[in-house]
Amino acid sequence: LSDKKVHLLMVLTSIFWSGAFITGKIAVGEFPPFALTFFRFLFALPFIFAILYLREPGNRIPRGKQWLPLLLLGFIGTFCYHSLFFTSLKYTSAINSSLIGAMNPIVTTFLAVLFFAERLTPSRLLGLILSFLGVFFVITNGDLQLVSQMRFNKGDIVMLVAVCCFAVYSLLSRRFMKRYNLSPLMVTAYTFLICVIISFPFFLWEKPSAYLASTSASGWLSILYMSVFASVLGYLIQMVAIQRIGAPRTAIFVNLVPIFTIIQSVTILGESVTLFKLLGAAIVISGVYLTTRPEAKSMYTERSKSSSKNIA
């Protein structure tokens, strides 16, 4: 594949990932959060394990000490993140969810500086400040009274917690893979499996008999889309892109996800876009770019090389 074709494929992947916010918003109207988490990764399992068995036959089954880090990563980065992600979509818009989700590299960098003495360059500091300012605009929609009265949308706060979970996953996965000799594909496959196992009792707790009979084809197709296009195909294309054009250049394409989400949210879901949300989106994307651009060599770009899983 030429670099141009890889770039086009990464644009397509950004559309896949942005579509997960749209289909997630559709699906939460019919399924509770734990059920969506369970079914999304249950449907993805056959595909991701087939890829693991074909590409890395030596990594088919974890050995001894490899299980504990996989359990921790599966719990924090897959189960907790996606349960919170789907919960947030019950209360907030797909636009807000995607813009707050775009903060992942920023929060990852912030935690790396705070807990792992990661170096904070001027461009990364500016990126942090801009991104937090942008999310402030998105959450408040320019209404400063929300701040003084501490009245924030529940879904926005839940999504912020979800991003923190994924940032912790990002930092831990980088270290665990080096320490326990885990490949990105092996981590992805087994965190999917662990998520399915952990979410199953919660899925039963939500009493599936009360809602499964009334679910529609669009609800199931939304889950299937998230499983195949956002989780499996998105991962594969990102992995190819990292091999062809490198992790830093691949990470830049994540900045397109909020843009495509805004377009799809307006055209498909009929969500409204205010001037403050557009301003917030521009500021967030600028901040993320400053933090993830190749020259910055941020924690996020290093993480992209070792763990190719996206927040959608």
Report residues per predicted region.
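Membrane-interface helix-cap regions at the ends of transmembrane helices
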Residues: 23-26, 30, 44-62, 133-149, ...
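Alpha-helical transmembrane segments of compact multi-pass small-molecule transporters, enriched
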Residues: 20, 42-47, 100-114, 129, ...
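Hydrophobic alpha-helical transmembrane segments of multi-pass integral membrane proteins
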Residues: 5-9, 35-51, 72, 127-133, ...
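Transmembrane alpha-helical core positions of polytopic small-molecule transporters
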Residues: 14-18, 73-82, 105, 139, ...
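Juxtamembrane helix-loop boundary signature in multi-pass membrane transporters
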Residues: 1-11, 57-58, 105-164, 282-312
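Hydrophobic/aromatic residues within transmembrane alpha-helices
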Residues: 27, 36, 40, 88, ...
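Specific transmembrane alpha-helical segments of multi-pass solute transporters/efflux pumps
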Residues: 16, 20-21, 49-101, 137, ...
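Helix-helix packing/entry segments at the starts of transmembrane helices
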Residues: 14, 37-39, 78, 82, ...
